[in-house]
């Protein structure tokens, strides 16, 4: 018989940098999960990735205090900032522009995000990522 699921925990954690401090410790502790076991498993699974790259993770907590977790692709905003070497987006995105991104860069980001997007094809995914870029105050070229 399948284990009874008691909840899902969604977090965004830098690759290879999971530790028991907030927000990880309190979120897992509320469900009675082994915090250090999660931190070791997460860090082991993300050691081949770029250190510090923010990754969304969905942790499934079971009634017997065990858990599983699924890593998602990094948020589009993080990938856009990395592609054009930005620290943060514009506070007034429609008036203050902070950079430019090309179609080739958008396609690269869309390919990275394909498994987590609901877009029908690459072109639709590129348009989705371009919309995110525009909402950050980044000018899109060739879209």
Curated annotation (Swiss-Prot):
<dbReference type="InterPro" id="IPR000911">
    <property type="entry name" value="Ribosomal_uL11"/>
</dbReference>
<keyword id="KW-0488">Methylation</keyword>
<keyword id="KW-0699">rRNA-binding</keyword>
<dbReference type="GO" id="GO:0070180">
    <property type="term" value="F:large ribosomal subunit rRNA binding"/>
</dbReference>
<dbReference type="InterPro" id="IPR036769">
    <property type="entry name" value="Ribosomal_uL11_C_sf"/>
</dbReference>
<dbReference type="InterPro" id="IPR020784">
    <property type="entry name" value="Ribosomal_uL11_N"/>
</dbReference>
<dbReference type="GO" id="GO:0022625">
    <property type="term" value="C:cytosolic large ribosomal subunit"/>
</dbReference>
<comment type="subunit">
    <text>Part of the ribosomal stalk of the 50S ribosomal subunit. Interacts with L10 and the large rRNA to form the base of the stalk. L10 forms an elongated spine to which L12 dimers bind in a sequential fashion forming a multimeric L10(L12)X complex.</text>
</comment>
<dbReference type="InterPro" id="IPR006519">
    <property type="entry name" value="Ribosomal_uL11_bac-typ"/>
</dbReference>
<keyword id="KW-0689">Ribosomal protein</keyword>
<dbReference type="InterPro" id="IPR020783">
    <property type="entry name" value="Ribosomal_uL11_C"/>
</dbReference>
<keyword id="KW-0694">RNA-binding</keyword>
<dbReference type="Pfam" id="PF03946">
    <property type="entry name" value="Ribosomal_L11_N"/>
</dbReference>
<comment type="function">
    <text>Forms part of the ribosomal stalk which helps the ribosome interact with GTP-bound translation factors.</text>
</comment>
<comment type="similarity">
    <text>Belongs to the universal ribosomal protein uL11 family.</text>
</comment>
<dbReference type="GO" id="GO:0006412">
    <property type="term" value="P:translation"/>
</dbReference>
<keyword id="KW-0687">Ribonucleoprotein</keyword>
<protein>
    <recommendedName>
        <fullName>Large ribosomal subunit protein uL11</fullName>
    </recommendedName>
</protein>
<dbReference type="Pfam" id="PF00298">
    <property type="entry name" value="Ribosomal_L11"/>
</dbReference>
<dbReference type="GO" id="GO:0003735">
    <property type="term" value="F:structural constituent of ribosome"/>
</dbReference>
<dbReference type="InterPro" id="IPR036796">
    <property type="entry name" value="Ribosomal_uL11_N_sf"/>
</dbReference>
């Amino acid at each position: 018989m399948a284990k009874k699921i008691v909840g899902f925990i969604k977090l965004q954690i830098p690759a290879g940098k999971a530790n028991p401090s907030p927000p990880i410790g309190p979120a897992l502790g509320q469900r009675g999960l082994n915090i250090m076991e999660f931190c070791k498993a997460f860090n082991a699974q993300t050691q081949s990735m770029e250190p510090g790259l923010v990754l969304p993770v969905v942790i499934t907590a079971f009634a017997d205090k065990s858990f599983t977790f699924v890593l998602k692709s990094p948020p589009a905003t993080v990938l856009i900032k990395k592609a054009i070497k930005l620290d943060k987006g514009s506070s007034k995105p429609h008036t203050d522009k902070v950079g430019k991104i090309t179609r080739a860069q958008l396609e690269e980001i869309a390919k990275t995000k394909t498994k987590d997007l609901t877009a029908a094809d690459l072109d639709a995914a590129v348009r989705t990522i371009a919309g995110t870029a525009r909402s950050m105050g980044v000018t899109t070229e060739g879209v």
